[in-house]
Every structure is written in structure tokens, then in C-alpha cells.
Amino acid sequence: MKKKLKLIIWPIIYLVLIFNVCISFILVFRSYYYRSIFVSGSSMQPTLNLDSNKSGVVDFGLIDDHDSAIKKIKRFQIITTYYPFPDSHDYVDGFDLEKENVVDEREASYKIKRVYGLPNETIRFVVDEDEMNAALAKSTTVTEALNSEEIQYHCRQAIQFYVKAPNSEVFVKQNIKFKRRINPYKITQYQNFEYELGEGEYWVMGDNYSASSDCFNKRAPIYYQNIVGVLISIEGTCKIVSDVKIDTTVDGTKVSYKCTNKKYHFPTYY
């Protein structure tokens, strides 16, 4: 009987040890290979930071900032980027496409957005007026419209997205599966909006159309060299607190933020 128990117990112990070693290796690899980030703001709601209004609670996760990942970016992936728009004070000396390193990280605005258009494509938005009118008929205030799933469904159906590939004459409608947060009173601005992207240019937008500073808001693309990384996963939530420090390299003070009180959940992969 004892011999039978040993024959059963020892293999189980070995399997548990091997499992723990594998998990430890994966965790160590992830922590060193990927870069940790936290999501600030509401521009990616309802996908990210859905609870950000609750006392500074935000999502945190991992991005892949290696060139191998950035060079293979696909449509609708979520990325982190520094913005090239001069009026947002993201660059001290403006933007120069010929320079390899155009970002002054002391001044840059660090964003997380979703990729809509890839280099050399032409993107187009079209509005279905019947769906737009259905959304408007059911809403009395912007707050109600943004919080009503029924109204938001009509809003999402109203804004349709098309892409024309390089060297093609045909626009192809894209199937958008992720949810977007849209102000029905501003849908008309998307009607027949079109933009032709050049080499190394990307079109990115936040999922929260009603509160996102992005390519549509600025009517301008971002560039390959602005991209920092591709979102791999959201690992949990944390609370962000400000950390004001004296910056000896520039005049004044520098405000940075850190992620505290981390609460992990099962990773959500993107």
C-alpha cells in the first residue's frame, strides 16, 4: 500500500515543482522582456480604464517595445506612442520626419491608442444617417447617450469605417468588433472624412470618440518613429499618485506619476 502511495505521490510532487518552475520562468521573462505601463485618462474607454473615475484607479499592463513587434503592427491593435502635433507641446523643436530621434521625452505627451490606418492606405469614415437619427431620437442628454448601451449600439452602427489598400481603387468596409464610446450629437463630423496616409504614417484613435485627443481630433497622422510599443496585456488595476520633482535640466518642476496599490487579475490579452 505504501509503495503504491509513493508511486502516486512522487510524480505529483515532481509535476507541481515543474509547474512552479515554469510559471516562475514565464513571470521573470515577462518582467524583463516586456515593458510595464499604466493607462492614464479615459480616451480608451470602454476597452481600458473603465473604472478610472474611481479615485484614480487605472489599468496597468505590458507592452512589447521591440522593433520586431512595432514593425508588424496590425490594424486595430492598441499601441503606445508619443504625439507629433506641435500645438500639443510634444516636441521642443517641432517634428522633423528626417530625424531618427525627434522626441524630447521631458516634453512629449505619451498616449495609448488603437491603430486604424497603416502606411500608404487611405481611410474613410461614412455615416449611416438612419442609425444616427435612431440614436438621437432616444437620447436627451450627452450623459444619457454615453451610458446607454442601446443608444451606443446605434452610434457604433452609424459610424462605418473603410480602408483602401495601396494601389487599389476599392474601399473595403472594416468589421469593428470592439466597443466604442460615441457622442451622437457629434457623429456628423465623421461623414465622408477621408485621409491618405504616406510612408511611415499611421492613423490612431481612442475608443472613446467623445473624449480622445488623437489623429481624427488633430486631422494628422502619427509616424513610425513615434511608436513606443504594442499592448500585450492588461494585468490588473492600480492607483496613480503624482511625484513632483525638481528638474535640473529645464526650468521649473517636473511632475511624474507612479503606480501604487497594484491589484492583479487574470491577464486580458490584446
Residue ranges and their predicted role:
Residues 10-30:
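Hydrophobic membrane-insertion alpha-helices, especially the h-region
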Residues 28-48:
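N-terminal hydrophobic targeting segments that direct proteins to the cell envelope
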Residues 5-13, 35-38, 50-270:
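Soluble "head" domains of membrane/secretory-pathway proteins
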